[in-house]
């Protein structure tokens, strides 16, 4: 059975309350609950991790090297700033899909660049919470 890790970056713990015009009204808990149901259907193990701290995300990626087959990551604000998370993903060489609830290319200019997209298997942006479900489906397909 494949192991898939979902990583959510800073402020995503505030989903449902924070800027619903950009991020929707679902909470992160709602999104993860839906993913867990889908993971059961796909017969994969799903692990969830959220942190507002860059170093904690780096450490979780590093510990994934031994038992995780695929990563789905929404780096949130770290998308545009974190060489450290990029280096961690590059080091472990675990395939990953980058997910964004909003379309980062329709936002402020500083939000349009990602430090991860060129390393990712794919990028899903602007589709809201369903983007996570699409990423999980794609991860399962890529692991076949």
UniProtKB/Swiss-Prot annotation:
It comes from the Bacteria. Its EC number is 4.2.1.10. Pathway: Metabolic intermediate biosynthesis; chorismate biosynthesis; chorismate from D-erythrose 4-phosphate and phosphoenolpyruvate: step 3/7. This is 3-dehydroquinate dehydratase. It catalyses: 3-dehydroquinate = 3-dehydroshikimate + H2O. Keywords: Amino-acid biosynthesis, Aromatic amino acid biosynthesis, Lyase. Catalyzes a trans-dehydration via an enolate intermediate. The active site is at 23 (proton acceptor), 100 (proton donor). Substrate binds at residues 74, 80, 87, 101-102, 111. Homododecamer. The keyword Nucleotide-binding does not apply. CDD domains: DHQase_II. It comes from Hydrogenovibrio crunogenus (strain DSM 25203 / XCL-2) (Thiomicrospira crunogena). The lineage of its organism: Bacteria, Pseudomonadati, Pseudomonadota, Gammaproteobacteria, Thiotrichales. It is an enzyme of class 4 (lyase). Coiled coil: none annotated. The record marks 18 as: Transition state stabilizer. The keyword Amino-acid biosynthesis applies. PANTHER family: CATABOLIC 3-DEHYDROQUINASE. One of its GO terms (molecular function) is 3-dehydroquinate dehydratase activity. GO terms for biological process: amino acid biosynthetic process; aromatic amino acid family biosynthetic process; chorismate biosynthetic process; quinate catabolic process. Belongs to the type-II 3-dehydroquinase family.
């Amino acid at each position: 059975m494949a192991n898939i890790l979902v990583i959510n970056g800073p402020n995503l713990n505030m989903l449902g309350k924070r800027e619903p015009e950009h991020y929707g009204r679902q909470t992160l808990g709602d999104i993860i609950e839906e993913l867990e149901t889908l993971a059961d259907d796909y017969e994969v193990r799903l692990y969830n991790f959220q942190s507002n701290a860059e170093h904690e995300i780096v450490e979780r990626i590093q510990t994934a090297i031994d038992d995780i087959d695929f990563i789905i990551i929404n780096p949130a604000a770290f998308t545009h700033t974190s060489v450290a998370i990029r280096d961690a993903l590059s080091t472990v060489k675990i395939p990953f899909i980058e997910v964004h609830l909003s379309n980062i290319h329709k936002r402020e200019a500083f939000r349009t660049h990602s430090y991860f997209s060129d390393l990712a298997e794919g990028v899903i942006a602007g589709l809201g919470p369903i983007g996570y479900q699409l990423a999980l489906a794609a991860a399962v397909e890529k692991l076949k």
